[in-house]
Structures are given as structure tokens and as C-alpha cells.
Amino acid sequence: MAQKPDGGAGLRGFQAEASVEDSALLVQTLMEAIQISEAPPTSQATAAASGPNASPQSSQPPTANEKADTEVSAAAARPKTGFKAQNATTKGPNDYSQARNAKEMPKNQSKAAFKSQNGTPKGPHAASDFSQAAPTGKSAKKSEMAFKGQNSTKAGPGTTYNFPQSPSANEMTNNQPKTAKAWNDTTKVPGADAQTQNVNQAKMADVGTSAGISEADGAAAQTSADGSQTQNVESRTIIRGKRTRKVNNLNVEENNSGDQRRASLASGNWRSAPVPVTTQQNPPGAPPNVVWQTPLAWQNPSGWQNQTARQTPPAARQSPPARQTPSAWQNPVAWQNPVIWPNPVIWQNPVIWPNPIVWPGPIVWPNPMAWQSTPGWQSPPSWQAPPSWQSPQDWQGPPDWQVPPDWSMPPDWSFPSDWPFPPDWIPADWPIPPDWQNLRPSPNLRSSSNSRASQNQGPPQPRDVALLQERANKLVKYLMLKDYTKVPIKRSEMLRDIIREYTDVYPEIIERACFVLEKKFGIQLKEIDKEEHLYILISTPESLAGILGTTKDTPKLGLLLVILGIIFMNGNRATEAVLWEALRKMGLRPGVRHPLLGDLRKLLTYEFVKQKYLDYRRVPNSNPPEYEFLWGLRSYHETSKMKVLRFIAEVQKRDPRDWTAQFMEAADEALDALDAAAAEAEARAEARNRMGIGDEAVSGPWSWDDIEFELLTWDEEGDFGDPWSRIPFTFWARYHQNARSRFPQAFTGPIIGPSGTATANFAANFGAIGFFWVE
């Protein structure tokens, strides 16, 4: 027991000299060692060893599952009853006495598992062929050795061991499935056997020295206890690099023609080697000197070859025949453009044109009923109609065809009774035949160049001035009622509510309404926005009424004048913070409701902005956002910067010229306003003269009963039960007040300084403030 069995050379000598009886004794001892093992193999190891698709042990490095099987097999082995190599020396000269190699076994390898693969004896008198056995692992105890018999028949104690004759190589190929390793052997050429054997011997040596490497999963198929026999067809098991030519022959079958082809592979789970084996044979497309062990890569076990591009049948590749253009294009309609009429031209009734006529432009002659001529066509000066020429019965003349000036109508030529005349075809001085009396020419007759149609035309039809003036009076009442809210009036509203069907003459109606407003009420209709066409009512310079309003609006307009002054003195713009700071000094605060002004914030940011007195906008590029106030469009027309500056100077008992910059700016604006007013007055006078508008426009009766209150829309609160309560003042009283004004009608100029008279200064102050209401 001092010597350790050699699992390498001793096993090869045992394989060469063993007899049938010795083989039977060895198998019986092996079976007893397995049956009396202390711990049965686990279900995991049994399942791995008896799987249906188990592949033989490979010369490749083991995987994790193979390591687990080795540990289970080592734990299941009997500690002390294992077969000892030195006990095999009791059989004589030709027995196991050659187990001398047990002394030569390395001391670091205490145990080795003997593995008999493809253990089918070749005959009744032949020794058992344990063709492949290799050390696969070590157990926990170095004095124990486990024998693992694969592909050996298990039987009872009294069973006689009969080893059937080994089938031939062709029969094994046909009857047994091929594994991944067996197929991989067939892919190598015979010339590479020696080199591959050396490589495999080196790998087996590495496996033998590794303590944690076990068999591959499903390396051998074990038979069940009932005696059923399974055979392993592993043909590529290496015993220290020894491999016979028979291994390659297992995967090759001979056919009648003498050529060799690869046998089909059985279905199973293919497993690729984690580490490639280097060789000089390179599969197609593989890196240099590397053979990949994956059977599905680079190799095709079924002999399948890459097919060339799929050939389309000749019939399927034929493209449809190209569309063939008809030999002759059939056009039932003759080409009509351009048309060159040769000479002669034969009509339905034979008509011979004496001179050739070439039509200059495109002419379409679809049929005689829709005959068209070119707009600029003129007949030759010397053309005469033949005496016997008759027009077709269904022929219609062109609507814009001009008759030659010197063309005389044939005496026997007559038009059809139902022939329609074009509106501009007959000249005014052309003689009309007696049978044309029933035809009524259109009033839009146009004469030829040498006709005297202008002498026969009478004066233009006079307009109904009374209807236009009546509609203008309605517009005056409408504008005065709409101005109650101080919201600018849109031209579209005037056209929709009052003018209506007189839209073609609406400029004259609006101008007549302006004339009535100026002459009777001292009010002027001013267009403040040329793009949106917004209109407001302002007092004329002669009325000295200032800003129109009622008594209840006096506090609001006074506050508005103060705000306009603050904006003007701060560079024509004032931020919201600056404006509220100035109003706080007057006792006015936002958020506190005033008894007369109401909500101050709403008054400044909504009402005055809607009435176009102020412009409230965001300061550009302000973060957080800030807002500022500017003058509105209405403020520029109802007052001026010079009036506001004089108001501020009067309050502070100072001269307006003390603020030099503001005074010069206000003076320039006043001069520009005078020039614009003079140009506008001249344009109005010219328009009224052209329209015939004079004093007779205001001479007629005046009545308020024809006003349509349902057309008016109101944005402020009011007494909707009594429409007349919406009128802010009595119009006739206002008219007479303007006539009896105690202020002079003519001023010395837009700028009144301290040198003016007291009456002039008083009038200027009131004009600057802009408040003069009828009580």
C-alpha cells in the first residue's frame, strides 16, 4: 500500500495484457465498489451522467458543471474499499504484474478515476478494450480511488459476463449518434493526426494535474439497474494522445460510387469550447491558426454549401412588354391654333373673300354658334362684302367684333330675327334697318373712334341728395350717442349700422355728417387711426368747449390733465411707480376707492386706455416686468403739450418758458399742428365743393325721432329703460352756448405769453385746462 497506482503507463500495460476473465473480475470488483459506496450519487450527478444527449468527455478544459460532477463522484467513492493497483499482481506472468508503473505515479496525485469508454469487447476471446481512460479528478482523501465505468452493463452477482462482438466502424456510424467531438474529428485531415495527438496529450496532462477538474456533463451514458444497455459513440476520446485511424472512419461511410460523405449528425445540445485550439488548418473565414470548437461555426455537418444567388426563372424575369405607341395618333378634332385661313375661304353659303386674311392671334373656331375673333382684328380697308353673300341662319357674331368704319351694309343683307347684338358692337351713328326696331340696344353702347356718341349722351343722372342728406343726419345722431362712452368709433360700425346699402357713396355721407356736426354743434369728426379707421368727436377751435363731457366727468378729466402733465414733464413717458408716487402726494392711492373717481387703478389702466387718452404698455426688456404710461391718440387731438405746459405754469405761478426743453418741444408741436390743420381744412373744402355740400345741408328740418337706439351698444352702466337718458347733454343748448360764447373767437396765436391781455390769458388758461362744460 506504500506505492501509489499510476493512472497513465500502468493502465496502458493493463490494457495490452488483460484477458477475458481478468476483465470480468475487474468489472465485478468495479460494480461492488460502486454499490457499496457510502453515499449514493446525487440526482444532479445522475442526471448529468445519464442524459439522453450526453456527449463524451472532451479534451477541452472542463466547465463549471463538469467540476460539480467530479466533486460528487469523489464524495460518492468508498474510502477504503477501492481497487488497489498492487493487488492486481496475483495472476501470473501475463497478468497485472506490469502495474509496476504504480511506483512511478507522481506523489502529488493520490487518486485517479479509471474510466472505461467504448468498453465493448471485440470478441469472446479478446481482451477488454478500455481504449480511453484518463485521470479526471482527485477525491478528498489521497488513499482512495474510485472507478467509474461508463458504457458497461450492470448485472446481478450471478450473472455471467458476456461481451458481444464489437460492431464494425460502418455499423457504429450508422447505428450510433455522433457527438460534437466525434463530428469535430471528421473535420480534420489525416495529415494533422500527429500534431493533434501531441496537442491532446499536453491538454490531458494539464487535466491530470488539476485537482478541481471533473468529467464533462454527460460524458458517458450509464445503464439503469434493470439491465438495459446503452452505448456511447464517443469516437474522439484521447488516452495520452493515442488515437487510431478508426476514429475518423466512424464518421465516414462508403457509398457504392466510392466517394466519401459525412454522416448526418444526431440532434442534441451543441456546446462550444470556451478556448479555441490552435492548428495549422483554418476553416473558411476564421482567424489565422485557430479552429473554433463550436460545431455550428465555420462547419456544416449536413454537407450544406452556401448557395449562389437565387436564380429567377427566365419566365419570371421577363419584364412586361413596353407600351407601344400607336402608329398614328388619332385626333378627331382638327388643330385650331393658330389658324391661317387660305384664300379663298368657302363658307356654308359660298363666300369668296377677295383678299387673303391672316388672323394674327390664336383663334378657336369650335362651331358657328360660338365664333370668336381676336380682340385686335381689323378688316382690310378696301374690303367689300359680295352682293350675293348670305350669312348662315344660325351664325352669331363675335361680342367684341368691330365693324370697319367705311363698311357699307349690303342692300339684301338681313340679320336673323333672334340674333342677339353684342352690347358694344353697334356704333351710335350706324343706320338701323327697319326690321331692327324691336331690338333694344344696351345702355352701355360704345361707339367707334369716329362716332359722335358723346354728343348723344345726356348729362349724368342727378343723385338723390335728399336721401344722402337724410342718411347723413342719422349718422350724426348715431355718432353723438356713441361718443357718450368716449370709446373711438370704427368705420365698420358706421357702415354696418347706418350707411348699409349706400356703401358705394359712404365718403360723401360721412362728409355731410361732418359738415352738420361742425355747423350745428361745434364738434369735429376726427380720424385718429388711419389703419384701423377709428374716429372720435372733438371740439372745434371756434367752440372753445375743450374736451367734451358731462358734469359728472369733471373730476376724471381734471385727474387726466394732471397725469398728462406728469408724463410730459418726465420725458413723454412715466413708469407706473413714478406716477403712483406723484399721485400719493395728492392723497390718491391705488387700492383705495375714491368717492368721486372710484377705483383709481381701473380708471388709469382700463378706462383711460380704452378711451385712447392713455397708452399703457410694458417697458421693453424689463425683468421683472414693469409698465409705463404714455399719451394716447385722443389726447393729441383734444389737447396739446403747450396747453398742458401752460396749465402747469399757472398752477405753480411760473412762466411756461422756465422749462426751456419742454417749451421748445411744445412750440414745435403746436406749429406742426397748425400746418396739419390748415392742410386738412383745405382738403375738406375741396371735397365739399366737389360733392356740392353747402349751407343747404343744415337748412332742413331736424328731428331726433328717427334714431334707432337698438343699433347702439353701450359698455358702461346706464338707464336702458329710457334711451334719451343716455344723451350726455342737450344738443340745442350746446349749439346756442357755442354761438353765445363770451370768449373771443380768434386768438393771437397758439402761444400766449405774459404780455397778452387779461381776457386773452383767461381764455388761454381755460383752453389749456380744456374744461368748459354746459351746466
From Swiss-Prot:
Disruption phenotype: Animals show shortened circadian period and reduced total activity. Interacts with DLX5, DLX7 and MSX2 and forms homomultimers. Interacts with UNC5A. Interacts with TRIM28 and PJA1. Interacts with NGFR/p75NTR and RORA. This is Melanoma-associated antigen D1. GO terms for cellular component: chromatin; cytosol; nucleus; plasma membrane; protein-containing complex. Residues 468-666 form the MAGE domain. Ubiquitously expressed in many adult tissues, except for the spleen. Expressed in osteoblastic and chondrogenic cell lines and also during embryonic development. Keywords: Biological rhythms, Cell membrane, Cytoplasm, Membrane, Nucleus, Repeat, Tumor antigen, Ubl conjugation pathway. PROSITE patterns: MAGE. It comes from the Eukaryota. One of its GO terms (molecular function) is transcription coactivator activity. It is a peripheral membrane protein. Residues 37-330, 374-409, 437-463 are annotated as: Disordered. Residues 39-50, 309-326, 375-406, 437-452 have a biased composition (Low complexity). InterPro entries: MAGE (IPR037445), MAGE_WH1 (IPR041898), MAGE_WH2 (IPR041899), MHD_dom (IPR002190). Its main location: nucleus. Residues 292-441 are annotated as: 22 X 6 AA tandem repeats of W-[PQ]-X-P-X-X. Transmembrane segments: none annotated.
